[in-house]
Amino acid sequence: MVPRPEQTPDALRAALAAVDPKRLPEMQRTKDEAFAKAVEWQSLSPVRSWVLTWARDIEIARRPDLAARHAHAKNNLEHEDADVAREALRELSAVLDEAMKAVHA
């Protein structure tokens, strides 16, 4: 398992390259957007949000248990059975919460 990266742009990028390299262009695009908003808003909150979002997503990708739960939940979000779709939404929320708590630990 890839170690949990520090919450810096370079460390997050290196970790993403190891666990989900196809998302690197998305990461760069959202980083550029966050930094542009930070300048426009004269606030670091868009940058902090970007860091936390990617730290959370990398946490999911680097942990097979979370990655499997995340994929299963996403695959069932639009299930024809409303109960299955609701459970998928609940599980997706639980996975995101667990990953966010882990990166705040």
Residue ranges and their predicted role:
Residues 1-36:
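Short terminal alpha-helical segments
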Residues 23-66:
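Amphipathic alpha-helical interaction modules
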Residues 67-105:
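Amphipathic alpha-helical binding modules
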Residues 3, 14, 18, 38-41, ...:
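Generic amphipathic alpha-helical segments used as scaffolds and interaction surfaces in large
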Residues 8-11, 59, 82, 89-91:
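General structural signal for secondary-structure boundaries
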